[in-house]
Amino acid sequence: MIKETIHESQKCQRNWDLGQSIAEEDKKLIIESATNCPSKQNLNYYKLHVIEDRETIEKIHEKTRGFGPIYSDYNPDLREENAYDPEKTGEMYTNSQTLAQMLLAFTKNEEGLIQREEDDDWEEDRAMAVGIAAGYVNVIATQLGYSTGCCKCMDGSEVQDILGEQPILLMGVGVADKTRNRREHQTEDFMFPTLKKMKNIETTYV
């Protein structure tokens, strides 16, 4: 079960069965995983917005339009030959993983950080903390039977206008639509490409 969770939680869910809901106890546990995971010196590097209001979710979703022609003919078996091409033009699509039943938005927290040195830069520590939190959410949500999808592709200033704070990461959590391929866009006629598994991470045992 745990091994299956590890591999299943890697996948980004692009469509949702919005007729279903997340159980309240499950919701609390998922939020706890995002707010009580490890961080450097237990400092609060981020704030968490738990968004369930459908109108707000859809407003944020509209600000994630940025996936499109640069990947439209991507061949996962020819990864190196299909490099990102910024010159391609065409229709851009939103990132529909953000349309889940619950949208988590991680935003910057500047309060409570200890200034140890004049040149302290918290960006690396913050990125690490958010990454750990997202990983916790991925695993816990998957163990509870839900799916997830992270999104960094957004108009940050527009999302900030909605949230009132600078966004770092958006993360959809919810009930997958089991009648569809997980890569199908929720509302548009588009199939997101998938990248061939290339994570043969060198591991050294001492």
Stretches with model-predicted labels:
Residues 1-20, 26-29, 33:
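N-terminal targeting/leader regions
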Residues 2-14, 169-206:
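C-terminal helix-cap and adjacent tail motif
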Residues 34, 104, 110-161:
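Small-aliphatic-rich amphipathic alpha-helix that forms the alpha element of a beta-alpha
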Residues 38-42:
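Glycine-rich phosphate/pyrophosphate-binding beta-alpha loops
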Residues 43-131:
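Glycine/small-residue-rich phosphate/adenosyl-binding loop
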Residues 47, 154, 173:
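Residue-level "edge-of-site" marker
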Residues 68-80, 163-184:
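A glycine-rich helix N-cap at a beta->alpha junction
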Residues 100-102, 144, 167-171:
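Generic beta-strand structural signal
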